[in-house]
Amino acid sequence: MTAPGLPLLRAPNLAVPHAFTTRAGGVSAGPYAGLNLDDRSDDPRPVAENRARLAAALGFAADDFARLNQVHGVQVVHAQAPGFWEGDALVTATPGVLLAIGTADCYPLLLADPEAGVIGAAHAGWKGTVGRIGQRTVEQMVNLGARPERIHAAVGPGICGEQYEVGEDVAAQFRAAGLGEWVLEREGRTHLDLAGANRALLEGAGVGDLWVSGRCSTEADFYSYRRDAGQTGRMWAVIGLPRREGQTGEARA
């Protein structure tokens, strides 16, 4: 396993190990070609290699990931060790755990309070955005000792508003949640600006420092569920606290 020159996107305001992946640098083939990190449809062998490459690029091992069966809900999981849970956000204060969120149009949110040693990661589709998954993640980070004004947050690549057409039923739920400012009307069609909505929600939660990638998942560099009619891979957004000197692997969940 090697990870030479693995192309990863980094947020300039996050001072802990982290990355937003693209589809470049991996070994998957076919519609998943590249750095696909989801093994539900792809051959699990190249996916395992892709995950190992990503972990190595950040100084972690392939079994350090804390992952989720994401269900477009608002459950925030406190991951005290690597493992696999159901939910749509993760928080931890445990060094050596690499939080991972999978996306292919939904927005990944990465958060860190380096002073407190607390990090978080969230999956924000339209349902999670309406449910304020970013704010809920901040709240759980505060429970672990973080302070909102010290949190640095990054909004990674996702489907841009110009490409994200939705039905009136979805737009109505956005408006009912107080997010009508991010419902866009384009030539008689309705779109959502998920990046703008999540940025505003994180600001409303008191987050002191925000960065937005501005990249759209429908670009060729990324996997996109909508662009590829569902037959596609997944990027991961990952964030971790480095192990302390002399620390070995934690017990597995």
From Swiss-Prot:
Coiled coil: none annotated. Its cofactor is Cu(2+); Zn(2+). Zn(2+) binds at residues 72, 106, 123. CDD domains: YfiH. It comes from the Bacteria. PANTHER family: PURINE NUCLEOSIDE PHOSPHORYLASE LACC1 (PTHR30616:SF2), UNCHARACTERIZED PROTEIN YFIH (PTHR30616). Belongs to the purine nucleoside phosphorylase YfiH/LACC1 family. This is Purine nucleoside phosphorylase DR_1966. It comes from Deinococcus radiodurans (strain ATCC 13939 / DSM 20539 / JCM 16871 / CCUG 27074 / LMG 4051 / NBRC 15346 / NCIMB 9279 / VKM B-1422 / R1).
